[in-house]
Swiss-Prot record:
SMART domains: Arg_tRNA_synt_N, DALR_1. A motif ('HIGH' region) lies at residues 122-132. Its main location: cytoplasm. It comes from Histophilus somni (strain 129Pt) (Haemophilus somnus). It catalyses: tRNA(Arg) + L-arginine + ATP = L-arginyl-tRNA(Arg) + AMP + diphosphate. This is Arginine--tRNA ligase. The gene is argS.
């Protein structure tokens, strides 16, 4: 259920009855402070201004027309025209009962869409590094959320599997195979790439062969395609190990690399020329966009085909948008990539729309993110200033979690301890990123992310196990709890109930905006409210059996919500810590 949506619809209906037009917005939001109610309608003043009415008079008119019987305990006008809404505790209790019985915790979807999510996108013949972390884990959290909401999600791992470098890589792979070098030498992809480049720079015979292989590959030569496919497969097998460690849902079946769109590129450039969108400029094919200006204030030129006939990333991204609409039949396409790619994506999509390749109804959304910084505020690097390999980062996360858990948890079996170390280590790296607004840069700090205090993975995982421990101390089963009635007699119970019922509106925001930090903030607030409830409202040692069972049900729904929420983020929970 979505309280915000229920209240918005009811208040908008009253606003229209009071004289507002169809486009009016109630702007209902959860209140920041208890004295302002549980929810507040903030759209009255703007609508009153449009109608030329006194905001408080209009608010009173709306208040008289709102039908919130059995939903709101009371409503009041505050300040210049806000409407404060205090929810009825019996209505809350009834909805907690319903939510607890629903496998999806009351979450529904109004309109199922087919949504393509383009994320991760590493390069072939190179190892994944920390620069791939944000796209991979933010994209995957949004994918999980959209699927939970009932949408048909198509994962698109837009890997860099094409380009002139493949001539040199194929030539070097051939050299290794001719020398009977073990495929194990490809375990270090960075070393393989460096060695290929060194041969290319220093051996003219090798370089000539590499250049020939580029042409052959682009012309579809069977041998070159086979060698190219080997490089792609070896790379993606190694990347899969990172995905599995990160508890990310990508598989090799989700690879939709740049090469997929190659057959479309000549046709797209020819069509752009035919439409008069692309013009020749110094041998290249260029689209000039009035919407973007260069430093001289003239329309910016976007190259779609180079003088030598080669295509660019822009051309590929135009083809990808067209393919996702026409072939994949998507309603919406999200691309998770660095903020520095924002202008590039906007230009590619503007050309796509100008050419009529997709309708206005097709949503193309760049979900950009900032950089991961070191404590010095500079891009995160190794001590020697090199790029941090993703596998090295995850190894260090496990080592640090091992030290942390070994100090704190002495009662765990070796199997339990290993599960906790993995959940905390990997979870800490992911949660530290996911809990930050993706559009901003963030500082990577081991001490903060592995802390059991604050908005961190260890704190959230411990909050979950703490509730599990309550149920481990009682022989009352979930089935036995089922007939018990929810009672919200204490204010802390009521506040916890409201937060539990806000799960859907939170998840809907994540699905719409692609912002997992909203879910992290919600789960952190939920854990805090449960902690306050647990301290002030006795559960197992309560003399009143009805109150005890009611509070156990609140605890059970909190446990389920924390587990489901963390799972949407791709973060594992453990039964004991």
């Amino acid at each position: 259920m979505n309280i915000q949506s229920i209240l918005s619809n009811k208040i908008k209906q009253a606003m229209r009855q009071a004289g507002a037009d169809e486009q009016c917005d109630a702007l209902v939001k959860p209140s920041g402070k208890p004295q302002f109610g549980d929810y507040q309608a903030n759209g009255i003043m703007a609508t009153a201004k449009k109608l030329g009415l006194n905001p408080r008079d209009f608010a009173q008119k709306v208040l008289d027309l709102i039908d919130l019987k059995n939903i709101a305990e009371k409503m009041e006008i505050a300040g210049p025209g806000f409407i404060n809404i205090f929810l009825d505790k019996n209505w809350l209790a009834e909805n907690i009962q319903v939510t607890l019985q629903d496998k999806k915790l009351g979450v529904t979807v109004e309109e199922i869409q087919t949504i393509v999510v383009d994320y991760s996108s590493p390069n072939v013949a190179k190892e994944m590094h920390v620069g791939h972390l944000r796209s991979t884990i933010i994209g995957d959290a949004v994918v999980r959320t959209l699927e939970f909401l009932g949408h048909n999600v198509i994962r698109a791992n837009h890997v860099g599997d094409w380009g002139t470098q493949f001539g040199m890589l194929i030539a070097y792979l051939e050299k290794m195979e001719n020398e009977h070098a073990s495929a194990m030498e490809l375990a270090d992809l960075e070393a393989f790439y460096r060695a290929a480049k060194e041969h290319y720079d220093n051996d003219e015979t090798f370089a000539e062969k590499a250049r020939n292989y580029v042409v052959k590959l682009q012309n579809g030569d069977a041998y070159c395609r086979t060698m190219w496919k080997k490089l792609v497969d070896i790379t993606m097998q190694q990347n899969q190990r990172n995905y599995d460690r990160l508890n990310v849902t990508l598989t090799q079946n989700d690879v939709m690399g740049e090469s997929l769109y190659n057959p479309m590129l000549p046709e797209i450039v020819a069509d752009l020329k035919a439409q008069g969108l692309a013009v020749e400029d110094e041998g290249a094919q260029v689209v000039y966009l009035e919407e973007f200006k260069n430093k001289d204030g003239d329309p910016m030129g976007v190259i779609v085909q180079k003088k030598d006939g080669g295509f660019l990333y822009t051309t590929t991204d135009i083809a990808a948008a067209k393919y996702r609409y026409h072939t994949l039949k998507a309603d919406r396409a999200l691309v998770f990539s660095d903020t520095r790619q924002s202008q590039h994506m906007q230009q590619a999509w503007l050309i796509t729309r100008k050419a009529g390749y997709v309708p206005d109804s097709f949503q193309l959304e760049h979900k950009n993110f900032g950089m991961m910084l070191g404590k010095d505020g500079k891009p995160f690097k190794t001590r020697s200033g090199g790029t941090v390999k993703l596998t090295d980062l995850l190894d260090e996360a496990i080592e640090r979690a091992d030290k942390l858990i070994s100090e704190k948890s002495t009662a765990l079996s070796s199997k339990e301890k290993a599960a906790v170390i993995e959940a905390v280590g990997i979870g800490s790296v992911k949660y530290a990123d996911l809990s930050k607004n993706r559009t901003t840069d963030y500082v990577f700090d081991w001490d903060i992310m592995l802390s059991f205090e604050g908005n961190t993975a260890p704190y959230m995982q411990y909050a979950y196990t703490r509730i599990r421990s309550i149920f481990n101390k009682t022989d009352i089963s979930e089935e036995q709890l089922h007939p018990a009635k929810i009672q919200l007699t204490d204010e802390k119970e009521r506040l916890l109930a409201i937060k539990l019922l806000q799960f859907e509106e939170t998840v809907q925001i994540v699905g719409k905006e692609g912002t997992p930090h909203i879910l992290c903030a919600y789960l952190y607030e939920l854990a805090g409210l449960f902690s306050s409830f647990y301290e002030h409202c006795p559960i197992l040692n309560n003399d009143n059996e009805n109150v005890k069972l009611s509070r156990l049900k609140l605890a059970l729904l909190t446990e389920k919500t924390l587990k489901q929420g963390l799972d949407l983020l791709g973060i594992k929970t453990v039964e004991k810590m």
